[in-house]
């Protein structure tokens, strides 16, 4: 089966990348920027909040092993989709919760996933569905961050392990074998 792609944002891309790298059926995860107005943005520019881009991940997946809807359910369970333009202490539109469908089918599934997530939250889901736009890969040092520098980064050590615990507790069937 051909690889399909999903683009989602849910806070710091180091943290979302770490979650999706562990999913059976995911063949690639790339951190990057999408949804803004600046061509070829840098991390520094995106962090400045003036480009309009979100920190996001582009997930390559085998739809015979994990569906787009499954990926969205995992995303909603491993970040707080009720926080507007932030995740924890990361504040700004670059940390927004968003889905960037690459097809009409993904658009419809995104709407259904938001409805499923809303049934599990008392506060309103603020995740946006945004038009697919140009994807800009983040700089090399951001790729596979948790497996490298992230293990020594205090921020990552505080944020990523709880996300992974949620993943393994709720979605054990989708967790890639070690």
Swiss-Prot record:
Annotated catalysed reactions: L-methionyl-[protein] + [thioredoxin]-disulfide + H2O = L-methionyl-(S)-S-oxide-[protein] + [thioredoxin]-dithiol; [thioredoxin]-disulfide + L-methionine + H2O = L-methionine (S)-S-oxide + [thioredoxin]-dithiol
The UniProt record lists the keyword Oxidoreductase: yes
Annotated keywords: Oxidoreductase
Active site positions: 12
NCBIfam families documented for this protein: msrA
Protein family: Belongs to the MsrA Met sulfoxide reductase family.
Protein name (record): Peptide methionine sulfoxide reductase MsrA
Species of the source: Erwinia tasmaniensis (strain DSM 17950 / CFBP 7177 / CIP 109463 / NCPPB 4357 / Et1/99)
């Amino acid at each position: 089966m051909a690889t399909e792609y999903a683009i989602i944002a849910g806070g710091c891309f180091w943290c979302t990348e770490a979650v999706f790298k562990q999913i059976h059926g995911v063949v690639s995860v790339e951190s990057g920027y999408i949804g803004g107005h600046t061509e070829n943005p840098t991390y520094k520019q995106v962090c400045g909040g003036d480009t309009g881009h979100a920190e996001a991940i582009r997930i390559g997946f085998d739809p015979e092993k994990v569906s787009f809807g499954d990926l969205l359910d995992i995303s909603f369970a491993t970040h707080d989709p009720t926080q507007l333009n932030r995740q924890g202490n990361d504040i700004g539109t670059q940390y927004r919760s968003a889905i960037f469908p690459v097809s009409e089918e993904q658009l419809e599934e995104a709407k259904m996933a938001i409805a499923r997530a809303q049934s599990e939250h008392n506060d309103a889901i603020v995740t946006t569905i945004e038009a697919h736009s140009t994807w800009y890969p983040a700089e090399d040092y951001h790729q596979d961050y948790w497996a490298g520098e992230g293990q020594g980064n205090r921020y990552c050590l505080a944020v990523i392990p709880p996300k992974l615990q949620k993943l393994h507790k709720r979605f054990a069937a989708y967790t890639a074998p070690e």
